[in-house]
């Protein structure tokens, strides 16, 4: 095969990778202010894009801390999802979550206050995202809230 043909095939392959990559998503578009407020049981401020792949909804007039009532959604990737499903650190355990998109798993860290210790990793097709609910001391309640929000977010993908 000539070097021109090889170069053409490489360019074609590299150029088409973008077509098969996970779609870029705006994390703030996955939930509405009303959906988040209904799940948290309180009014929340409009979505605030913290970073290109991170969006946060928080209750007004609260200190900016991990204990404040808020929701964060992060656009993730297959690698992070794989680590959540099969943790390599013994202080983190994976708990299967059913009825959410194509697949989902809770990542729960031990030795961390409830709220910041639970994250819900979700997969739908080639898209991945993570839901975090903060500010509630009951872990099972946090997990239920994360599930409700994840199911709602899945409908937007």
What are these regions (language model features)?
Residues 3-16:
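Bacterial N-terminal signal peptides
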Residues 11-12, 20, 71-72, 81, ...:
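Small/flexible residues
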Residues 16, 67-68, 121-122:
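Generic N-terminal leader/processing signal
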Residues 16-18, 133:
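General secondary-structure edge motif
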Residues 19-58, 94-96, 127, 137, ...:
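N-terminal "mature-domain start" segment
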Residues 34, 38, 42-115:
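Short, solvent-exposed recognition patches
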Residues 87-157:
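A short, solvent-exposed beta-edge/loop patch
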């Amino acid at each position: 095969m000539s070097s021109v043909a090889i170069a053409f095939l490489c360019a074609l392959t590299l150029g088409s990778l973008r077509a098969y990559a996970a779609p870029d998503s705006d994390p703030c578009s996955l939930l509405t202010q009303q959906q988040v407020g209904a799940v948290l049981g309180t009014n929340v401020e409009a979505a605030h894009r913290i970073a290109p792949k991170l969006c946060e909804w928080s209750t007004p007039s609260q200190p900016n801390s991990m204990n404040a009532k808020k929701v964060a959604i992060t656009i993730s990737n297959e690698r992070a999802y794989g680590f959540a499903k099969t943790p390599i650190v013994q202080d983190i355990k994976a708990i299967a979550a059913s009825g959410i998109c194509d697949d989902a798993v809770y990542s729960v860290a031990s030795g961390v206050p409830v709220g910041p210790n639970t994250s819900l990793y979700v997969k739908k097709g080639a898209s991945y995202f993570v839901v975090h609910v903060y500010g509630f001391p009951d872990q099972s309640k946090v997990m239920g809230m994360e599930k409700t929000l994840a199911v709602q977010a899945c409908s937007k993908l």
